[in-house]
């Protein structure tokens, strides 16, 4: 009922109560009062001062050069592409400096550049480097960049509009902004109404233009879609792209990118129509969107690189500066302040001013990342992501991400039930991310490379199970979008963090279940490890490949292997064609251990094997004539001809290597025993033992996983009785 009431109220507000942009200037996210306060307070506030100086350096630099607005020619990374990007950023910083200092040299620069664009834009055809079957722009090869240009430029215009002569203002608004709004919202109708980050940027840019130009129609189309019926537009984006927990369906990399237009446009709505309560929408969804996004980072503050992600992006990015500032302003969440302080800058906005004041009143603290289960899907029923985190002896943490989320639309990868693992600063089990060199013109104009589809999206490029060398859902987004994995159970305690999920639709006749447990044993609470149990079940025989992607250098194995002297690809399709077979071995029945060194620490994977198990070491680079793929390695466990199989692996950090002292400690795996001691239709029991420690049993329920279910099982002379979906206990 709340949703219906909000929609009705919104319609009424837009048709009857929307403010005219002529009533008050500026109308977006930096008011005249806030600009005056920033000017007066920055000398005594280090965060405001550093933020002001950051923009001042950029603005002063552009004043040294003439305004240049080139005819669009280049793809991403090329001169004209980058120049148009710099131009909107330059205008934005110059407009900020004018608002704070009152120096008309800055406003004059913005006005001159906007006039230059007003002369150019009406004459532009679609971009000459546009890509077939991809929404094109005029200034840029893709329409997305056009919306980003408007997003920043309309903010700059908002701050200097009253300084520009009426005649020039009319030309800028008619020839440039209204022309561009028409192109983005009418000529690019499909993108404008798409539930996707491209659509988010488009509606945010057009909506803010509507506020600045005093055009209620623009605002309403932006918020409720072109037909003004609420089936598309900003509110629908909030409804469909985020789960109730604030998880964005395309994953954290694109959540980082999209959070800027979501938060800034929401702030513009709140400034112009506070009665709409946009920041209370869907139970404070935008607050959860920011806090969940921050949690989706590792200890290097990098976003977990699932789906189409450029690795190394951190929460120090410009998008998060704005998003965290606005989130603090609106929700007064003190947990955000350590991130803002660490960033060292605030946005020069109303929100940035409020946030800087709050930071100055608090002591320095570190950002607290916690174990958590994050639901996916607009109703929270499309699987999710589990973050398992435990402190370790080195004063950092062992972090695991277990992905059992939905497809993630076109940017999603086929990595159902995939995992990532980090140990402090070290990436232990990695994800390739996206095959793209963003804005590097030499690499296909900075676009996604063809290897993104042929390798990076494929299941074998992830830490998950692959059947018959075929990717999940045959690598088809349309098929993958029909179903999501099912969460079976989860339990977060001090000594164990455990999550189990099932995927029954990725293959026609293979059911997959993965249970991931991070365990800190009583005898060694500061040395957590990962117990990974991956079950494959089918009525027909298959080849099952469980892949572990590892950085670092192989140190030793417990099994013999043969190094290939002549390199060949692991297969012909679905990403296998890009993997060189570097070495292989047959370990026989028992357990196989592989140890590698990454940074200054050793890591081992110990896995149960039998006579049919084959082990492979692979490396990217096959059938890659242009060296588009980074050189990365994998350890692949293959089980051939099996209908059902249980992969049981224990992944442990151990020891250290000090190149300065030339010392090595505990380079060998501590695992002495790993066994599957019981298995039937209802239960599965694994035993494991570390050197000089007692053995433990992990019992899992395969059928009833209700937390109140009672279970009893006899294992040898030991009777196991427990309540819930699992039991972890000492072996007697």
Residue locations for each model-derived region?
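Short, hydrophobic/aromatic-enriched beta-strand segments in well-ordered soluble domains
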Residues: 548-550, 601-621, 645-656
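Non-catalytic terminal regions with compositionally biased, polar/charged low complexity
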Residues: 635-646, 651-732
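Aromatic-lined, polymer-binding surfaces characteristic
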Residues: 27, 32-42, 49-51, 56, ...
């Amino acid at each position: 009922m709340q949703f219906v009431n909000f929609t009705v109220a919104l319609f009424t507000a837009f048709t009857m109560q929307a403010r005219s942009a002529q009533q008050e200037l500026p109308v977006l996210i930096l008011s005249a009062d806030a600009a005056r306060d920033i000017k007066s307070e920055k000398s005594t506030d280090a965060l405001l001062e550093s933020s002001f100086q950051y923009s001042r350096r950029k603005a002063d630099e552009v004043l040294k050069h003439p305004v240049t607005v080139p005819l669009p020619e280049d793809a991403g990374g090329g001169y004209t592409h980058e120049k148009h990007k710099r131009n909107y950023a330059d205008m934005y910083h110059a407009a900020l400096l004018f608002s704070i200092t009152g120096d008309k040299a800055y406003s004059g620069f913005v006005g001159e550049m906007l006039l230059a664009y007003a002369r150019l834009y009406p004459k532009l055809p679609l971009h000459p480097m546009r890509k077939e079957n991809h929404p094109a722009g005029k200034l840029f090869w893709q329409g997305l960049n056009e919306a980003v240009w408007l997003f920043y430029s309309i903010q700059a215009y908002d701050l200097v509009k009253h300084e520009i002569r009426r005649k020039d203002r009319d030309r800028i608004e008619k020839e440039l902004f209204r022309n561009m709004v028409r192109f983005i919202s009418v000529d690019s109708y499909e993108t404008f109404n798409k539930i996707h980050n491209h659509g988010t940027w488009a509606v945010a840019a057009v909506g803010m233009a509507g506020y600045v130009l005093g055009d209620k129609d623009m605002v309403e189309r932006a918020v409720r879609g072109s037909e003004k019926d609420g089936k598309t537009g900003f509110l629908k984006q909030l409804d469909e792209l985020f789960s109730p927990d604030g998880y964005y369906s395309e994953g954290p990399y694109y959540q980082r990118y999209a959070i800027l237009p979501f938060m800034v446009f929401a702030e513009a709505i709140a400034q112009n129509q506070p009665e709409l309560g946009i920041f209370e929408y869907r139970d404070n969804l935008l607050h959860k969107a920011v806090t969940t996004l921050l949690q989706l980072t590792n200890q290097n503050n990098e976003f977990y690189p699932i789906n189409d992600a450029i690795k190394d992006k951190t929460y120090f990015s410009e998008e998060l500066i704005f998003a965290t500032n606005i989130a603090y302003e609106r929700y007064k969440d003190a947990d955000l302040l350590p991130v803002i302080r660490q960033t060292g800058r605030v946005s020069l906005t109303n929100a940035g001013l409020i946030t800087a004041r709050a930071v100055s009143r608090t002591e320095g603290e570190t950002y607290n990342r916690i174990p958590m289960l994050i639901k996916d899907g607009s109703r929270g029923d499309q699987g999710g992501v589990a973050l398992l985190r435990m402190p370790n002896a080195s004063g950092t943490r062992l972090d695991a991400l277990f992905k059992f989320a939905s497809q993630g639309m076109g940017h999603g990868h086929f990595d159902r039930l995939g995992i990532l693992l980090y140990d402090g600063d070290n990436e232990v089990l990695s994800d390739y991310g996206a095959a793209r060199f963003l804005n590097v013109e030499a690499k296909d104009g900075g676009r996604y490379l063809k290897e993104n589809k042929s390798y990076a999206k494929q299941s074998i490029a992830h830490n998950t199970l692959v059947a018959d060398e075929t990717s999940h859902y045959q690598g088809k987004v349309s098929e993958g979008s029909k179903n999501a994995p099912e969460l079976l159970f989860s339990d977060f305690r001090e000594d164990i963090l455990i999550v189990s999920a099932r995927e029954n639709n990725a293959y026609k006749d293979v059911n997959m279940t993965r249970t991931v447990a991070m365990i800190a044993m009583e005898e060694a609470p500061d040395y957590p490890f990962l117990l990974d149990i991956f079950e494959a079940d089918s009525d027909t025989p298959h080849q099952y490949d469980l892949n572990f992607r590892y950085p670092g250098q192989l140190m030793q194995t417990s099994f013999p292997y043969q190094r290939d002297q002549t390199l060949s690809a692991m297969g012909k399709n679905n990403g296998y064609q890009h993997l060189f077979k570097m070495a292989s071995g047959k370990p026989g029945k028992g357990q196989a251990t592989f140890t590698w060194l990454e940074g200054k620490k050793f890591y081992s994977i110990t896995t149960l094997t039998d006579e049919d198990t084959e082990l492979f070491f692979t490396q990217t680079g096959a059938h890659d004539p242009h060296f588009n793929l980074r050189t990365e390695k994998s350890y692949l466990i293959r089980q051939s001809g099996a209908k059902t199989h249980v992969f049981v692996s224990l992944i442990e950090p151990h020891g250290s290597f000090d190149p300065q002292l030339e010392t090595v400690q505990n380079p060998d795996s501590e695992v002495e025993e790993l066994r599957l001691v019981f298995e039937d239709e209802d239960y599965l029991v694994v035993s494991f033992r570390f050197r000089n420690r007692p053995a433990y049993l992990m019992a899992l329920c395969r059928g009833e996983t209700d937390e109140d279910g009672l279970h009893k099982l006899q294992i040898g002379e030991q009777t196991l009785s427990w309540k819930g979906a699992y039991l972890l206990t000492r072996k007697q």
